[in-house]
A protein has these predicted regions:
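C-terminal structural segments of small proteins and small subunits
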Residues: 79-84
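Short S/T/G/P-rich N-terminal loop/turn motif that feeds into the first structured element of a domain
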Residues: 1-73, 94-111
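Nucleotide phosphate-binding site architecture
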Residues: 76
Length: 111
């Protein structure tokens, strides 16, 4: 599964502190950062919605691994750094697909 994080940085150093520790916390539960990015431009979008300036895409082995990351008591002080170090945070999870057939109601690859 993938977790897509879109956000703006708050005017403090909390997300910087979060980022120094988060790689280990994510890795502990089998996750890995697939991509990091800063907004380059808006190609098409809803004019009523401001784009977020930062993007982090994390791959995780399962929804259970994601929940274990969120609920790990060893890192309970970590999540407030992310929450208070950002603004306008959007966070979604997506299941992994080999191609788009499942979206269209078709058979899975290899079935």
């Amino acid at each position: 599964m993938y977790a897509l994080n879109l956000f703006d940085l708050a005017d403090n150093d909390l997300y910087h502190r979060y980022s120094r520790r988060s790689v280990g916390a994510v890795g502990k539960h089998g996750g890995r950062v697939v991509a990091l990015g800063r907004l380059e431009r808006t190609v098409k979008g809803d004019p009523a919605v401001d784009p977020r300036t930062a993007m982090v895409l994390v791959e995780r082995p399962s929804p259970q691994a994601f929940d274990a990351f969120l609920e790990d008591p060893e890192h309970e002080d970590l999540h407030p750094l992310r929450e208070d170090g950002t603004r306008n945070y959007l966070w979604w999870t997506y299941d992994r697909m080999e191609d788009l057939r499942r979206l269209f109601g078709g058979p899975e690859p290899g079935s």
